[in-house]
């Protein structure tokens, strides 16, 4: 559909949230300035080719950004075949952006027999409200999920004891959030309130651990590209600008937010979107849900990372730094952070004094780097020599700690 539109119009500016595969057509890419509001995996290949304009917008602000910054006047989405009453359904992928249908002048939709009819809020539109329709039947994209590795499982093991029966889950994408979801089989009366519902959460629903009247999401990224009747019957689809509103999300009881990040400093500043000055991802819903969890009664947020990463030359570097390096950005401020978790433990930083934060962060760093981090903190006047002395003797690398 996008290719056809681009062929007929000299210049088309594309503003997109999370799905950019249509731009892989050379006809589209050559003639469409592309603005990404998230910069997902599919978008990153466009960084190398040029023509990508990056933005980092909190997901609950995406519709406002599209309206006020980009002045989007046309919405293009894929929809289901109409039902007996003439309603087209946005399905498990398109509902996230459906709020835009009230903000634009034109709605050009592609009917796809493989798009499924979902339930929820603002999840459908009557055919009479659509400017133009075309048709292209094709299977929906499938999403491959890497199974959690041993390190992911170690990180999840520090979170699982802090999740209670009856809590409400928001988990992100990746090995660590998947490990958390898999580890919750056997729990009771859990709710799911998440922007992206993944295969791991679908399996959690099927395990019996979830109260099926408490499942809401904006996007479903399933491995099959097709939801079964069980999932369709129990997932309520909500536009992302509505679901991610921190004030709405905070109404969920015991909101548990689990997301990944790239690095953090000793005071708890978290970078989840840039490496060496290059935008790698976007803020997405991380900050939305960190703030929502803090407001939720009994809520907790967990930002997770491996304690180290290995450079191409084999050099091991700590992902916990005394200070964020040049080129890093602060995705989640330290004043919002609750828990930061590595394979070495979970550091509870919420409203803690700076020296307490620094000691907690050093304890969850890899043992090889703890002494050096403590010395840097002393040199910067952030930690007293007496407090730093506890890190002079390092535990064995296999020893785990919890703060």
Where are these regions (language model features)?
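Conserved alpha/beta enzyme-core scaffold
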Residues: 1-403
């Amino acid at each position: 559909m996008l290719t056809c539109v681009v062929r007929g119009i000299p210049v088309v500016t594309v503003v997109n949230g999370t799905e950019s595969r249509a731009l892989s057509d050379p006809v589209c890419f050559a003639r469409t300035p592309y603005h990404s509001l998230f910069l997902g995996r599919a978008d990153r290949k466009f960084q190398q080719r040029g023509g990508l304009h990056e933005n980092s917008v909190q997901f609950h602000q995406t519709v406002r950004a599209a309206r006020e910054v980009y002045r989007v006047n046309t919405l293009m989405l894929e929809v289901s075949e109409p039902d007996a009453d003439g309603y087209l359904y946005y399905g498990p992928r398109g509902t996230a952006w459906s709020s835009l249908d009230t903000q634009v002048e034109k709605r050009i939709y592609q009917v796809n027999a493989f798009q499924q009819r979902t339930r929820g809020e603002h999840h459908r539109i009557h055919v009479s409200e659509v400017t133009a329709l075309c048709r292209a039947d094709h299977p929906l994209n499938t999403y491959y999920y890497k199974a959690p590795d041993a390190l992911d499982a170690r990180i999840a093991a520090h979170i699982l004891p802090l999740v209670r029966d009856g809590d409400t889950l928001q988990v992100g994408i990746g090995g660590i959030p998947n490990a958390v979801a898999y580890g919750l089989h056997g729990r009771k009366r859990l709710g799911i309130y998440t922007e992206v519902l993944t295969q791991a959460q679908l399996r959690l629903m099927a395990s019996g651990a979830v109260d099926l009247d408490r499942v809401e999401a904006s996007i479903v990224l399933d491995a099959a590209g097709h939801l079964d009747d069980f999932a369709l019957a129990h997932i309520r689809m909500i536009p992302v600008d509505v679901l991610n509103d921190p004030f709405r999300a905070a109404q969920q009881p015991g909101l548990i937010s689990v997301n990944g990040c790239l690095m953090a400093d000793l005071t708890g500043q978290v970078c989840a979107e840039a490496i060496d000055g290059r935008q790698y991802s976007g803020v997405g819903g991380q900050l939305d849900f960190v703030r929502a969890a803090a407001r939720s009664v009994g809520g907790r947020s967990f930002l997770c990372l491996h304690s180290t990463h290995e450079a191409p030359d084999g050099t091991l570097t700590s992902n916990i730094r005394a200070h964020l390096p040049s080129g890093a950005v602060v995705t989640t401020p330290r004043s919002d952070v609750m828990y930061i978790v590595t394979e070495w433990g979970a550091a509870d930083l919420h409203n803690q004094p700076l020296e307490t934060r620094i000691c907690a962060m050093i304890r969850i760093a890899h043992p090889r780097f703890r002494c050096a981090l403590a010395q840097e903190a002393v040199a910067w006047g952030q930690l007293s020599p007496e407090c730093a002395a506890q890190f002079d003797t390092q535990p064995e690398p296999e020893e785990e700690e919890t703060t």
